[in-house]
C-alpha cells in the first residue's frame, strides 16, 4: 500500500463520493479490516440513489400503472375515470430515494465506515482536505484514496439549462406539473426514459437525436423497434437531427429543427430537456496538484483503477467508459482488491449489461452482430418473439423480441439483445452466458420454467442452434 508522505495516515482508505461505486468500495475495504472513511458533499447514495437510477425507476413505475389503468377492461377490471397525479408520483419517487439513501447510511454504519459530510480536495502527500458544512476544515491522511465522484450533465452551447424552461434530468424528476409539450434533446438512455415517462403522463413529446438512430450503441434492430414503439405511442422522433436558434420565452421554448436533406422547421414546446450525456465530476478536486491525469473530462486509469498518482484510484463515472451504476460497483471491488494486494481481473466492458427502462424496455450485453462480424467472427444469430410467449400473452405484452449472437465455430454466445416488457429482468442469464462462454446448446438444454419470459431466451438459442446445423 502507498504510504502517506507528509501526513500521519489516519485511514487506510479514504473514499470521495458515496454513490454505488463509493459506498461499495468503502464497505468492501472495511471488510478487509482496513480503516476506512467516506466523504460526501451532498446526500449519501450519490446521483444514482437520489437523482438518477432509483427515483427515475419509481417515476417510470407510476407511469406504467397509469398506462395500465387507462385500459383495465381488457383484464376484467372496472375503475372508472383515471387521472395522473404528478405531485403524488414525485412524492413517492422522492420517498423511495430517501429510503434508499437511509439504506446506504445503515450499511456504512454497520461496516464501521466513518462518514464525513463535506467537500473533499486532494492536497498531496496522501492528504485530503474536507470543508465541512459549517465552514470548518478537517485534514485527513490516507494510505489510499479512491475517487468516486461520479458525473455531471454535459452542457451544450446554446442549450444552457436555466432550471425552468431548459432543464436537465434532475429538474425533470421534480416538475410540479406535466408540461403540455416537451422537447427532449438526446436519444440515449436518460432521454428515452424521460421522454416515455412524460409522454405517458400526458405531455406531447418530441425527441431530437443527433445520431442516425436512438440508443446508437445498441443493436440496430432494437433501436428501430423502439423508435416504432415510441411513434405508435405518440412520441415524435427525429434522428440525424439537431436544434439551432433555441429561444426561451415566458410561454416556453422555440427552436429550429435541422435535419440533413430536409427544410428546417420550427419546434415549440413548454420546456426542453437536455439529455446529451455527462462528463466526469472532477472540478475542484485538486487533481492537477497531485498529478492525477485526465482525458476528455474523465480521470485516466489502468485496468485496476489506478490513476497516474501513486495511491490514488478512480472508479465509476469519473473514470469514463460506460456510465453505469453497476459498472461503478464492479470497479469498487477491483480497486479495493488492488489496494489489498490482490491481482483483480480488469473489467471487460462488453460484458457489462446495459438497460433502458422505458416500456418496452431494452437490455443488452456483449457484442452486437455488427461488432462480432467486425471482430472476425463467423456468427450465428437466433431470434424469438415475445408474441410467441405464453407469459407475454397472459400479460398482454406482445411487443418485442430476443436476438442472440453466437460464434458459429464454437457455438459460444457473444452477445444478447432484447426489447420487450421487463426485458431488463432477463439480462442476467445472458450476461452469465457471455461471461462463461455458454453455448447455444447449453442454453437450449437448460430447463426454463413455464410460463416465463425467460423461455424467449431458450427459443432464440434454439433458433441459432438450428442455423448452425
Swiss-Prot record:
<dbReference type="InterPro" id="IPR001100">
    <property type="entry name" value="Pyr_nuc-diS_OxRdtase"/>
</dbReference>
<dbReference type="InterPro" id="IPR050151">
    <property type="entry name" value="Class-I_Pyr_Nuc-Dis_Oxidored"/>
</dbReference>
<protein>
    <recommendedName>
        <fullName>Dihydrolipoyl dehydrogenase</fullName>
        <ecNumber>1.8.1.4</ecNumber>
    </recommendedName>
</protein>
<dbReference type="InterPro" id="IPR036188">
    <property type="entry name" value="FAD/NAD-bd_sf"/>
</dbReference>
<keyword id="KW-0520">NAD</keyword>
<feature type="binding site">
    <location>
        <position position="317"/>
    </location>
    <ligand>
        <name>FAD</name>
    </ligand>
</feature>
<dbReference type="InterPro" id="IPR006258">
    <property type="entry name" value="Lipoamide_DH"/>
</dbReference>
<dbReference type="InterPro" id="IPR012999">
    <property type="entry name" value="Pyr_OxRdtase_I_AS"/>
</dbReference>
<feature type="binding site">
    <location>
        <position position="325"/>
    </location>
    <ligand>
        <name>FAD</name>
    </ligand>
</feature>
<feature type="binding site">
    <location>
        <position position="57"/>
    </location>
    <ligand>
        <name>FAD</name>
    </ligand>
</feature>
<keyword id="KW-0963">Cytoplasm</keyword>
<comment type="similarity">
    <text>Belongs to the class-I pyridine nucleotide-disulfide oxidoreductase family.</text>
</comment>
<comment type="subunit">
    <text>Homodimer.</text>
</comment>
<dbReference type="GO" id="GO:0004148">
    <property type="term" value="F:dihydrolipoyl dehydrogenase (NADH) activity"/>
</dbReference>
<feature type="binding site">
    <location>
        <position position="120"/>
    </location>
    <ligand>
        <name>FAD</name>
    </ligand>
</feature>
<dbReference type="Pfam" id="PF02852">
    <property type="entry name" value="Pyr_redox_dim"/>
</dbReference>
<keyword id="KW-0676">Redox-active center</keyword>
<dbReference type="InterPro" id="IPR016156">
    <property type="entry name" value="FAD/NAD-linked_Rdtase_dimer_sf"/>
</dbReference>
<dbReference type="GO" id="GO:0005737">
    <property type="term" value="C:cytoplasm"/>
</dbReference>
<feature type="binding site">
    <location>
        <begin position="275"/>
        <end position="278"/>
    </location>
    <ligand>
        <name>NAD(+)</name>
    </ligand>
</feature>
<dbReference type="GO" id="GO:0050660">
    <property type="term" value="F:flavin adenine dinucleotide binding"/>
</dbReference>
<comment type="function">
    <text>Lipoamide dehydrogenase is a component of the alpha-ketoacid dehydrogenase complexes.</text>
</comment>
<keyword id="KW-0274">FAD</keyword>
<feature type="disulfide bond" description="Redox-active">
    <location>
        <begin position="48"/>
        <end position="53"/>
    </location>
</feature>
<feature type="binding site">
    <location>
        <begin position="186"/>
        <end position="190"/>
    </location>
    <ligand>
        <name>NAD(+)</name>
    </ligand>
</feature>
<keyword id="KW-0560">Oxidoreductase</keyword>
<feature type="active site" description="Proton acceptor">
    <location>
        <position position="450"/>
    </location>
</feature>
<dbReference type="GO" id="GO:0006103">
    <property type="term" value="P:2-oxoglutarate metabolic process"/>
</dbReference>
<feature type="binding site">
    <location>
        <position position="209"/>
    </location>
    <ligand>
        <name>NAD(+)</name>
    </ligand>
</feature>
<dbReference type="InterPro" id="IPR023753">
    <property type="entry name" value="FAD/NAD-binding_dom"/>
</dbReference>
<feature type="binding site">
    <location>
        <begin position="40"/>
        <end position="48"/>
    </location>
    <ligand>
        <name>FAD</name>
    </ligand>
</feature>
<dbReference type="InterPro" id="IPR004099">
    <property type="entry name" value="Pyr_nucl-diS_OxRdtase_dimer"/>
</dbReference>
<keyword id="KW-1015">Disulfide bond</keyword>
<dbReference type="Pfam" id="PF07992">
    <property type="entry name" value="Pyr_redox_2"/>
</dbReference>
<keyword id="KW-0285">Flavoprotein</keyword>
Amino acid at each position: 500500500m502507498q504510504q502517506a508522505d507528509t501526513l500521519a495516515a489516519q485511514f487506510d482508505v479514504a473514499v470521495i463520493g458515496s454513490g454505488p461505486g463509493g459506498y461499495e468500495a468503502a464497505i468492501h475495504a472495511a471488510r478487509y479490516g482496513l480503516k476506512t472513511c467516506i466523504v460526501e458533499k451532498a446526500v449519501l447514495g450519490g446521483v444514482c440513489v437520489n437523482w438518477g437510477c432509483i427515483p427515475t425507476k419509481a417515476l417510470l413505475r407510476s407511469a406504467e400503472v397509469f398506462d395500465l389503468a387507462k385500459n383495465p377492461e381488457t383484464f376484467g377490471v372496472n375503475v372508472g375515470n383515471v387521472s395522473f397525479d404528478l405531485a403524488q408520483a414525485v412524492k413517492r419517487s422522492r420517498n423511495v430515494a430517501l429510503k434508499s439513501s437511509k439504506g446506504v447510511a445503515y450499511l456504512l454504519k454497520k461496516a464501521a465506515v466513518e462518514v464525513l459530510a463535506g467537500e473533499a480536495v486532494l492536497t498531496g502527500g496522501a492528504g485530503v482536505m474536507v470543508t465541512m458544512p459549517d465552514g470548518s476544515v478537517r485534514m485527513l491522511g490516507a494510505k489510499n484514496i479512491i475517487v468516486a465522484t461520479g458525473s455531471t450533465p454535459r452542457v451544450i452551447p446554446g442549450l444552457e439549462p436555466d432550471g425552468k424552461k431548459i432543464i436537465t434530468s434532475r429538474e425533470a424528476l421534480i416538475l410540479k406539473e406535466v408540461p403540455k409539450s416537451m422537447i427532449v434533446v438526446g436519444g440515449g438512455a436518460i432521454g428515452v426514459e424521460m421522454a416515455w415517462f412524460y409522454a405517458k403522463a400526458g405531455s406531447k413529446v418530441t425527441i431530437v437525436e443527433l445520431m442516425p438512430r436512438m440508443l446508437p450503441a445498441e443493436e440496430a434492430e432494437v433501436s428501430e423497434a423502439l423508435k416504432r414503439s415510441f411513434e405508435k405511442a405518440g412520441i415524435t422522433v427525429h434522428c440525424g437531427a439537431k436544434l439551432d436558434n433555441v429561444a426561451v420565452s415566458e410561454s416556453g421554448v422555440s427552436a429550429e429543427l435541422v435535419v440533413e436533406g430536409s427544410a428546417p422547421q420550427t419546434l415549440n414546446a413548454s420546456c426542453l430537456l437536455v439529455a446529451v450525456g455527462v462528463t466526469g465530476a472532477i472540478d475542484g478536486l485538486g487533481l492537477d496538484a497531485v498529478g492525477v491525469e485526465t482525458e476528455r473530462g474523465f480521470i485516466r486509469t489502468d485496468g485496476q483503477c489506478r490513476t497516474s498518482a501513486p495511491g490514488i484510484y478512480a472508479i465509476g463515472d469519473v473514470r469514463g467508459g460506460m456510465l453505469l451504476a453497476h459498472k461503478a460497483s464492479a470497479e469498487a471491488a477491483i480497486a479495493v482488491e488492488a489496494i489489498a494486494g490482490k491481482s483483480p481481473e480488469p473489467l471487460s466492458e462488453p460484458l457489462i449489461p446495459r438497460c433502458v427502462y422505458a416500456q418496452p424496455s431494452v437490455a443488452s450485453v456483449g457484442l452486437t452482430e455488427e461488432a462480432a462480424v467486425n471482430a472476425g467472427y463467423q456468427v450465428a444469430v437466433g431470434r424469438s418473439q415475445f408474441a410467441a410467449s405464453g407469459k407475454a400473452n397472459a400479460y398482454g405484452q406482445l411487443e418485442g423480441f430476443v436476438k442472440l449472437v453466437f460464434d458459429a465455430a464454437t457455438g459460444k454466445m457473444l452477445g444478447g439483445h432484447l426489447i420487450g416488457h421487463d426485458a431488463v429482468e432477463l439480462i442476467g442469464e445472458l450476461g452469465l452466458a457471455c461471461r462463461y462462454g455458454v453455448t447455444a446448446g447449453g442454453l437450449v438444454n437448460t430447463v426454463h420454467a413455464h410460463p416465463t419470459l425467460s423461455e424467449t431466451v431458450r427459443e432464440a438459442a434454439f433458433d441459432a442452434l438450428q442455423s448452425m446445423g
